[in-house]
UniProtKB/Swiss-Prot annotation:
Region (Flexible loop): 101-111
Top-rank lineage group of the source organism: Bacteria
UniProt entry keywords in alphabetical sequence: ATP-binding, Cytoplasm, Magnesium, Metal-binding, Nucleotide-binding, One-carbon metabolism, Potassium, Transferase
Entries under HAMAP family matching the protein: S_AdoMet_synth1
Subcellular location per the Swiss-Prot or TrEMBL entry: Cytoplasm
Cofactor detail note: Binds 2 divalent ions per subunit. Binds 1 potassium ion per subunit.
Name recorded for this polypeptide: S-adenosylmethionine synthase
Catalytic function, reaction form: L-methionine + ATP + H2O = S-adenosyl-L-methionine + phosphate + diphosphate
Binding site for ATP: H17, D160, G161, K162, R226, F227, D235, R241, K242, A258, K262
GO process annotations (BP): one-carbon metabolic process; S-adenosylmethionine biosynthetic process
Pathway participation: Amino-acid biosynthesis; S-adenosyl-L-methionine biosynthesis; S-adenosyl-L-methionine from L-methionine: step 1/1
């Protein structure tokens, strides 16, 4: 029996967290390549530490990329523009170690095969309007509001920050927020009282639904006391270190592959996006209230070696019918995924902070629910509804 009454916790980090800085630089490189060369192959990793950025990877493209300029522009947009913050876009060194993609990989990918082996997961549930788990969606809401408040005038806030939200479930449904943790980098000069008041009033109160907050909700702000040293000075940043933040906050499973810095021929990214697209349409169609999809690939082979659908006992029709409907409605080869979701556009830098899923921007094509009717028909749900209405 699944747990019915429990607490579930998810975390998010701001765009100024060093690992997210690395993700955004890697995806800025990918976008720069796709603008000039949609057929370019990109596997870009970034590392940041005090005073420098290192960009490394395998990139095969006709595009001409100014890597140092791109890195500095990204860091500047994030907000690190002074040595007082521990990192300065204007003075940081940028090291570049980029080679071409191995021809051994290229011979399989160029003919439409998967760029690597592996399994990828997609997940959706009906806990929020975005069909995302409540804990991760609320954690992202806090970090987004933290960045918004910083840019709106709370000049003692710095770009680095994290949130953590614990949601109480009863009978399997989210009913209240039990604990909120916010850790934000700040200027040395600000008092704890001023900081705590600002975060409570300008961040938490604006980010989270009032109906889920009560007198018993614990609010913890910078629990260690102070957070002056942050960003790459406080922690080394590396691409691909926040894969649970990027996805479902631990509520859905993860195949292990990171997203940022990878062009869509890499199924680590594109098939995970397709998994989300499928799961979201299953839930939107009313076929289930929770859905997880697993797809798996072999390198150089176009069709997935397996497709699995798990609805955790919430399906309105047999899961086998849903799985067959998925294969009927969705193209699952890398080429079909890329074409179906229009993934050769330079849209990836925006995905690299505040989650790849549960977003409302139109560029996030994998968040559409335009296949729900076709899926319901293919799974036989429309016939069941028609009979029930007679």
């Amino acid at each position: 029996m699944p747990l019915q009454d429990f607490l579930f916790t998810s975390e998010s980090v701001t765009e100024g967290h060093p690992d997210k800085m690395a993700d955004q630089i890697s995806d800025a490189v990918l976008d720069a390549v796709l603008r000039q060369d949609p057929k370019g192959r990109v596997a870009c990793e970034t590392l940041l530490k005090t005073g420098y950025v290192m960009i490394a990877g395998e990139i095969t493209t006709k595009a001409r990329i100014d890597y140092p300029k791109l890195a500095r522009e990204t860091v500047r947009r994030i907000g690190y523009t002074s040595g007082d913050m521990g990192f300065d876009a204007n003075t940081c060194a940028v090291l570049v170690a980029v080679d071409q993609q191995s021809p051994d990989i290229g011979q399989g990918v160029d003919t439409g095969g998967a760029g690597d082996q592996g399994m990828m997961f997609g997940y959706a549930c009906d806990e929020t309007p975005e069909l995302m788990p409540a804990p991760i969606q609320y954690a992202h809401a806090v970090t987004k509001q933290l960045a918004k408040a910083r840019r709106a005038g709370l000049d003692f806030l710095r770009p680095d920050g994290k949130s953590q939200v614990s949601v109480e479930y009863r009978d399997g449904r989210p009913v209240r927020i039990d604990t909120v943790v916010v850790s934000t980098q700040h200027a040395e000069s600000v008092s704890n009282k001023r900081l705590h008041e600002a975060v409570r009033e300008q961040v938490i109160a604006k980010a989270l639904p009032k109906r889920l907050l009560d007198r018993k909700t614990r609010i913890l702000i910078n629990p260690t006391g102070r957070f002056v040293i942050g960003g790459p000075m406080g922690d080394t940043g590396v691409t691909g270190r926040k894969i649970i933040v990027d996805t479902y906050g631990g509520m859905g499973r993860h195949g292990g592959g990171a997203f940022s810095g990878k062009d869509p021929s890499k199924v680590d990214r594109s098939a995970a996006y397709m998994g989300r697209y499928i799961a979201k349409n299953v839930v939107a169609a009313g076929l289930a209230s929770r859905c997880e999809v697993q797809v798996a690939y072999a390198i150089g082979v176009a069709e997935p070696v397996s497709v699995m659908v798990d609805t955790f006992g919430t399906a309105k029709v047999p899961e086998g019918k849903i799985a067959r409907a998925v294969r009927e409605v969705f193209g699952l080869t890398p080429r079909a995924i890329i074409e179906g979701l229009d993934l050769l556009r330079p849209v990836y830098e925006k995905t690299a902070a505040y989650g790849h899923f549960g977003r409302t921007e139109k560029t996030f094509t994998w968040e559409r629910t335009d296949k729900k009717d076709a899926l319901a028909d293919a799974a036989g749900l429309s016939k069941i509804r028609a009979v029930a209405s007679v």
